[in-house]
Amino acid sequence: MPFIDDALLWCPDNDGRLVGGLDLATCITDDSTVDAENINPTIGANSSTLQQQQQLQQQQLQQQQLQQQQQQLQQLQQHQQQQQQQQQSADLCGSAARNVNVVVEPLCGSDSSDELFRTLSESNFEIESLLSDLATVEVKVENEENNNNNNSNVISDNDFAASQAAVVAGDDLLAKDNVQLSVQGLVDSVGARSADSGSGNGHGQALLAFGSATATATAASSRMVSFVTCRTTESMQINILFGFRLGFLLPCDLLNNNNNSNNNGSNGNGNGNGRCTPEESRFVTVTSASANPLLVEKLMSKCLNIDKRNDKLDDTEIPIVKQSTSPSPHQQQQQHQHQQQQQQQQQQHLQQTQQQQQQQQQQQQQQQQQQVFGSATTLLHIKTEQNALLTPLQQSQQQQQQQQQQQQQHSLQANNNAHQQQQQQQPLAIPHRPLLHNLLSGGAIHNPHHRNYTTATTGSFPPSPADSGVSDVDSSSSGGQPCADELKARLGMPTTAATSASAAAAAAAATHSAAAAAAAAAAAAAHLHTGTFLHPNLYQNNAANSLRNIWNRSVGVPDNYYGNSGSSSGGGGGGVGGVNPGTPGAPSYLTTSYFNAPAAASSQRSAAANGFGTHQHHSLQHQQQQQQSYAPQQQQQLSHHQQQQQQQQLHHQQQQQQQQQQQQHSQSQLAAAQLASTHPHQLHSTPHDTHSTIANAAAAAAAAAAASVVSSSSGRSGAISVAGSQSVIQQPATSSVNYDLSYMLELGGFQQAKAKKPRKPKLEMGVKRASREGSTTYLWEFLLKLLQDREYCPRFIKWTNREKGVFKLVDSKAVSRLWGMHKNKPDMNYETMGRALRYYYQRGILAKVDGQRLVYQFVDVPKDIVEIDCNGV
């Protein structure tokens, strides 16, 4: 097989210079005589034999080229259809197949070729070789003594194969002029493979080599080979890598695009728009003096997989290769096998990439699930660590007992339903609240009897959440249903939402969750039975939780606003207070702040006095009723997974309590009560849950385990002597805010509950709420009471205009202290109380008096109040 040797590029007459842009006609003696010495000295006498073999192979290869041409044309049409669907703008070039349409014309005598070689001569590279055998990886460098370049420009076979196609001039038609051979099949393969790479990543590259002989040139011109690299980007870019003066058969406009990276100018056919039509790119005619069929066949076979390796060539790398010998058929077979192996490796790599992506997606989903339940898991570990008396043996027992939890759920729920029915008939009668004079003078509690609402003493002003006397609140958060519920809770009536508790039970049953249904049934059966108000130090937990829950729902404070410090600080309350919590009847006072969960006080009361289990369970029922009545329809949103998790954790707490009871340690008993009482709120205080969902979930969990959790404090210490499986779990409030009415958390005496039937609600929405005599709760009522008491009027407060309802705070500090004593808030000051008074402006209870300090006006003054002469002191 003939080759283009370095002898064609090297001539002694050139003074040791590479041919570069010189005329090689002087190096070739005759254009009609093909001398082996001038053509290829390495071939020598064997050139004639190789030429005969080449003629036989050429005929066979031409038939193969025709077949491949048809197949590649079909592939090109398919790629073009895909490109037309993907590309919406004509400005995008798409692929090299549509951008490159080179019609080679003889340009031997044109001025553009001179400009081209002038440009190439100024470049920083030299031509080391014209042709390299593409089947071999090893690059053989000849004439190293004349090599002025380093080996950095030499690329391997695989890198050179990354170019899309090549047409190399042969030497069989050296003496023939104006002979044109169409190598459309090769160019079609260029278009087909360029469509894949060009449309995919915009970096498809095609390396085209053209060679020919013209009528005005000598036979040496057929030896010239030019390489063109075509890159497909947003704009057409054609880089002429190197070429020779007599050998370039490209148009001048194409050659001038050498260093223009964003040139959309004329292409080979002179379109002037930088783009080619599909028909033009499908048939690219290359005018050539000759073609080497064997090399063309190898190049065409090489370009089948070059689109998968085109990323090996850098955008600015110049593919210059050394000349080497011809490969044997065995080497070609090895090369074909190597290409198949590369294809298999690439397919495996793609499969691995897809598997990695799937694994990453699964990991992300697992991380999201961990984020959803991560908070509850963390709290579970914290609660376990707080119990310092838990041994490793007990921990192993807990793990075994957790596995048996599923078998015990049905019995827990059945016992819960039966126990709820027992507790329905045991409502709590709360002691009554003293009059204002007794409160201020330190008198004792007396005359516990029911008082009904009347408008004969204090008027008809509605109560307000601002009467807690803490700070400013949102005006839009008050009024409406929450306030009505608050009033009815104070009256000892079931709230209006209690009538829909049966609907909540039906909604819970729709979720196929027995625990939720049991909680809804317990909420329907439980009601408040509060008579009048207690002394501030004697407020029960259920009243505190009911008022806090109602007000917090109207404000919209998050459920984990203050966290749960009761489980840690309240647990050690017995030791800090200096009272043995195991001693019956010895009260263990709270050492926690006002904002701790009510569960802390409830658990300590349970461990400090006997016979309070009924009250605690009644309080639990009331809280469940409050939580269920707020959003009964949201019970459906509680997932079965959350309920199972709650029940499992409650069973876990039960096992901890039983193990601690065996240790017979009073401190461990108190800690277990704290741990059990604070569980439902801690389990669900995740930041992303809504407070209504948490309330329903916690209520369902507490109801499911209410009948099964046995008091751990009722062992030898006799802390709780309630018969049966009395529960000590006190459901904490779903939220804690500044308005939590902390005086309700104080300890005090309790009376045993009397069986009563629940009263039906009598007040509806929109009805003005009236207060009761001697139980002033709201700030405006408190001030109105002071104005009717000669002990304080006009000493601390007085009327300035009785008819208009204008009054003045004579001693604002004293009034604020009295209000703080009334609300059991010793840190109350006028600044805090004044914010509550200003809140009444928005409620329409008080009116602002301009220009006067400490002066306020009642909008609607009751006419039947006690008249006091405030003029004299």
From Swiss-Prot:
Expression triggers: The expression of this protein is developmentally regulated and is correlated with the 20-OH-ecdysone induced activity of puff 74EF.
The keyword tRNA-binding belongs to this UniProt entry's keyword annotation: no
A cellular component annotation (GO) from this entry: nucleus
The UniProt record lists the keyword DNA-binding: yes
Compartments it resides in: Nucleus
Composition skew (Low complexity), residue ranges: 330-346, 400-426, 466-480, 621-676
Residues in the DNA-binding region annotation: 777-859
GO biological process, alphabetically ordered: cell differentiation
Ranges for region Disordered: 321-346, 400-427, 439-485, 605-689
Coiled coil segments of this chain: 45-155, 330-426
Gene Ontology molecular function terms on file: DNA-binding transcription factor activity, RNA polymerase II-specific; sequence-specific DNA binding
InterPro entries: Ets_dom, ETS_fam, WH-like_DNA-bd_sf, WH_DNA-bd_sf
UniProt cross-references to SMART domains, sorted A to Z: ETS
Keyword terms, alphabetized: Coiled coil, Developmental protein, DNA-binding, Nucleus, Transcription, Transcription regulation
Family, per entry: Belongs to the ETS family.
PANTHER family the UniProt entry points to: ECDYSONE-INDUCED PROTEIN 74EF ISOFORM B (PTHR11849:SF191), ETS (PTHR11849)
Protein's job: Probably acts as a transcription factor during metamorphosis.
Name under which the protein is recorded: Ecdysone-induced protein 74EF
